[in-house]
Each structure stands twice: as structure tokens, then as C-alpha cells.
From Swiss-Prot:
This is Uncharacterized aminotransferase C1771.03c. Disulfide bonds: none annotated. PANTHER family: AMINOTRANSFERASE (PTHR43094), AMINOTRANSFERASE CLASS-III (PTHR43094:SF1). Keywords: Aminotransferase, Cytoplasm, Pyridoxal phosphate, Transferase. The lineage of its organism: Eukaryota, Fungi, Dikarya, Ascomycota, Taphrinomycotina. Its EC number is 2.6.-.-. Pfam families: Aminotran_3 (PF00202). One of its GO terms (cellular component) is cytosol. One of its GO terms (molecular function) is pyridoxal phosphate binding.
Length: 459
């Protein structure tokens, strides 16, 4: 929003924007309307939202059924404090999510962002160990190049170095990191998939033994990696091996599906394709589809049984947790996903997107790798395809691709730190599940122009 202000140092009036933008010295374009898979700017420019924002808008923009559900709820109850009351949309949403996997989950807890969902899961894990009399179990093992959110605890378990750097001095010292499952970058030449999995499993076990099994609370991983490694998918057997190591030492197995969950990879939960189940899981983005800020923790029986036996509440609340309007929006989104078979559609359209990406970019000299599942895809941009050499980090290739993409009519999610948290670049695609084949053709054509123009613009 702009307004005319009068400064104290001058009688002259000037227009000033007071919003703290992503870059304080650059005002991004303003979206004045959004419909389906498209965004419309002030000047009438139409841009395809090829990432659903930040892998959020699974239903696309402007779904009237969701908007009507929010309006209807706003006429009943807009806000109550969940410390003292419940509300109908929250109860219905929890019942829907948990009842689909009653053998896996016991309860659902709703917060406001992916970061809050991760914080909630981590806090519940630590409180669980206190309740069972093992309060020394407070060490979290995560993965390098993981990204779990922007709050301090979530950042401390993550591996995106540029976002962590300003706060290094206050991070928890009870976190450590093992290698991610990142076949393109870290599977060795001549190494079989089974050998690669065994090596990663041994690394996790060695880290548990180094810390001390009696001190390790949980292992946390993104089922399909998101912002940092750009949709790096696990190789077959990886998560089964990780789960086996965790079970051996009694370590909580926590899967973060803030970005990859709720249908994004072609199944409701990404872990359904891995043959494992989590002890606890975080969800967010496609839970509410961007219509309201909402996230959740799906709590398994191992943890919930102890809370029930001890009659223990979670040690802390969020003011807006289980917000009635947010839950009504999410309930509408989840109802539509199931009724209209949109998760299955994400799998179907994902196959077509995969075909088009490989057809277009397999021979591109600056696309080193194409990876993903469902409607969740990453393209790693490299300087040399044969050697996998990346561009220097200071080139900010992902950000440049994002900017140039908008000039070609497509918004792509920029990625950096792909290789080690600092080096490496990718762009991420996560279009709405309602995208059509014709729109996928449009997306890939614009992306081809974007990547070619981006590389041409580099020093």
C-alpha cells in the first residue's frame, strides 16, 4: 500500500512504501488478481504461477468453494482461544486427516506456518522424552542441506547456510547433521543403490553412537527434499534403512512433509511411496492451499499414548492455533482434493510434466539433473554438464532465473546452496494440481526460454 506522508525535515510530500519487502531496496511487482494457475499484475501482465507460490496453491487461485467456506465460517465464529475452547472446523479437519491412517496417527495439532509445525513437532518430541523419564534425550540429528523452517529451532536443524549465518551464535548445540540422500551429487561412481543406502545408514548409526544413543531424541528428514536440494528424491530402500536404524536405538523417526506432503508428490503423504511410516509428521503448504495460513503436526501413537497416560498438555500454545477460519479453509481444500481426485490428478499430470521436462532439457548443456515426483520437480542449473561444475554462488543463478522467468511469463521458485548449503543452483516447480496438459506445455516452453536467457545473462 502507498500513501502520501509529510516528513519532518521537509515540507515536501513524497510517496513511500512502508512494507518490509524481501529486499528493502526493491519493491516487487504487485499482484492485483489471481485466478487458476495465473497471476495478474498492476499493468495487466499475466504470469503463470508454476510453483503455486512456495509450493502452496494446490487448488490454484480463486477457488470459490473455499472462499465461500471461509465466509460462512466468519459469520459464525472468527476466533476463539484453543486453550479454553475447540471449534467445529478444527475438529472436522483433524478427524479427516487422522481417520485416513488411524494405525499411524493418533491426533492432529494445527498451527499457522510450516516453521511453527516443525517447532511443534520438535517440542513434542522433547517433551515426550521428559514424560518417559529420559530428559537427557534432547539431541536432534537432521540432514545437511535440509530445510525445515525459519524459526530458530527449525533453522538449527536445517542446513541452508545463508539463512542460518546471522543467527549462528544462538542455535541449539544439541543438533548435528548427516548426509542427505542426494543421488545426483553424492552417490559414488560404481556404487550400487544398495551400497549407497548402506553407507548412509551406517553414517546415521555412527552419528547416533558418537552422540550416545541415550542422548538422541529424533532423526528428522524431508521425505522429498524441497527448497535446498530442489526435489532430491530418496533412492529405493533409503527410508526403510533409516527407520531401521532409528528403531534399533529407540530414536523418534520424524518426517517433515511441509513442502512434499498433502498430495504434492502424487500420494497424500510422500512416505506412502517409501514403505515406512513416521512417528510424527509436519504438514503445511497444501493443507490450506494458501487460502489461509495453517499448518499441522500429525502425532503418532507412540508419542500420543504417553501424553494421554500422563494427562499432559503440550507445554505452550500459539495464539492463533486451530484458527476457525483457517481450519474451515483447510477443510474445504482437503474435501475438494479428495472429492475431485486431485491427488491422483497430481500424479497423472506429474508424469506428463516429467516427460516434457526430460524431452526439453535432457540435452540442455546447463541442466545437470531433472528430479522429482508428482507435481514437485527441480532442475539443477550447472556451468558444465559433464563435470557437474556449478556457477559461482555470487552469480545468484536461481534468483536471476526467477526474475527472467517473470519476463517470459512464468514464476519459478529459486534455489541456492544445492550442493552444500552454499554452492549450487536450481529452480523448483510445484504447479497447482488443476494444471492442464496445455498449461504444462506453456510452462515448459517458458522455462526453456528462461534458463537459456539466464545463462546468457551471466558474466
Amino acid at each position: 500500500m502507498t500513501e502520501t506522508v509529510t516528513t519532518t525535515s521537509s515540507d515536501k510530500s513524497e510517496k513511500k512504501n512502508y512494507l518490509f519487502y524481501t529486499s528493502p531496496n526493491h519493491r516487487p511487482p504487485t499482484v492485483v488478481r489471481a485466478e487458476g494457475v495465473y497471476l495478474y499484475l498492476e499493468d495487466g501482465t499475466r504470469i503463470m504461477d508454476a510453483t503455486g507460490g512456495a509450493a502452496v496453491a494446490c487448488l490454484g487461485h480463486g477457488n470459490k468453494e473455499v472462499i465461500d467456506a471461509m465466509h460462512k465460517q466468519s459469520e459464525k465464529v472468527c476466533y476463539i482461544h484453543s486453550m479454553g475452547f475447540s471449534n467445529e472446523p478444527a475438529d472436522k479437519l483433524a478427524n479427516l486427516l487422522v481417520s485416513e491412517h488411524p494405525d499411524v496417527f493418533a491426533r492432529a495439532y494445527f498451527a499457522n506456518s510450516g516453521s511453527e509445525a516443525v517447532e511443534t513437532c520438535l517440542k513434542l518430541i522433547l517433551q515426550y522424552w521428559q514424560l518417559v523419564g529420559e530428559k537427557q534425550r534432547c539431541h536432534i540429528i537432521a540432514r545437511k542441506q535440509g530445510y525445515h523452517g525459519n524459526t530458530l529451532f527449525a533453522l538449527s536443524v536445517g542446513g541452508m547456510k545463508p539463512r542460518k549465518q546471522p543467527y549462528e551464535g544462538v542455535f541449539s548445540h544439541t543438533t548435528s547433521h548427516v548426509s542427505p540422500c542426494f543421488e545426483y551429487r553424492y552417490k559414488e561412481n560404481g556404487e550400487t543403490t544398495e551400497e549407497y543406502v548402506a553407507r548412509l545408514a551406517k553414517e546415521l548409526e555412527d552419528e547416533i553412537l558418537r552422540v550416545g544413543p541415550e542422548k538422541v531424541a529424533a532423526f528428522v528428514a524431508e521425505t522429498v527434499s524441497g527448497a535446498c536440494t530442489g526435489c532430491a528424491t530418496p533412492v529405493p530402500g533409503y527410508f526403510k534403512a533409516m527407520r531401521k536404524v532409528c528403531d534399533k536405538y529407540g530414536v523418534i523417526f520424524y518426517l517433515d512433509e511441509v513442502m512434499s506432503g498433502i498430495g504434492r508428490t502424487g500420494t497424500m503423504h510422500a512416505w506412502e511411496q517409501e514403505g515406512v511410516t513416521p512417528d510424527i509428521q509436519s504438514i503445511a503448504k497444501c493443507l490450506g492451499g494458501g487460502y489461509q495460513p495453517i499448518s499441522g503436526a500429525l502425532v503418532g501413537h507412540r508419542i500420543m499414548n504417553v501424553f494421554e497416560q500422563k494427562d499432559a498438555a503440550m507445554a505452550g500454545f500459539f495464539t492463533y492455533q486451530a484458527h476457525p477460519i483457517a481450519c474451515s479453509a483447510a477443510l474445504a481444500v482437503q474435501t475438494i482434493l479428495r472429492r475431485d481426485h486431485l491427488v491422483e490428478r497430481a500424479a497423472e499430470m506429474g508424469k506428463y510434466l516429467s516427460e516434457k521436462l526430460h524431452e526439453t532439457f535432457d540435452s540442455h548443456p546447463n541442466v545437470g539433473n531433472i528430479r522429482g515426483r508428482g507435481l514437485f520437480w527441480g532442475l539443477e542449473i550447472v556451468k558444465d554438464k559433464a563435470t557437474k561444475e556449478c556457477f559461482p554462488p555470487e552469480y545468484k543463478v536461481g534468483s536471476l532465473a526467477n526474475k527472467i522467468g517473470c519476463e517470459h511469463g512464468v514464476f519459478v521458485y529459486p534455489g541456492m546452496g544445492t550442493i552444500d548449503g552454499t554452492r549450487g543452483d536450481h529452480v523448483l516447480l510445484a504447479p497447482p494440481y488443476i494444471i492442464t496438459r496445455e498449461q504444462i506445455d506453456e510452462l515448459v516452453e517458458a522455462l526453456s526460454k528462461t534458463i537459456t536467457s539466464t545463462v546468457a545473462a551471466l558474466p
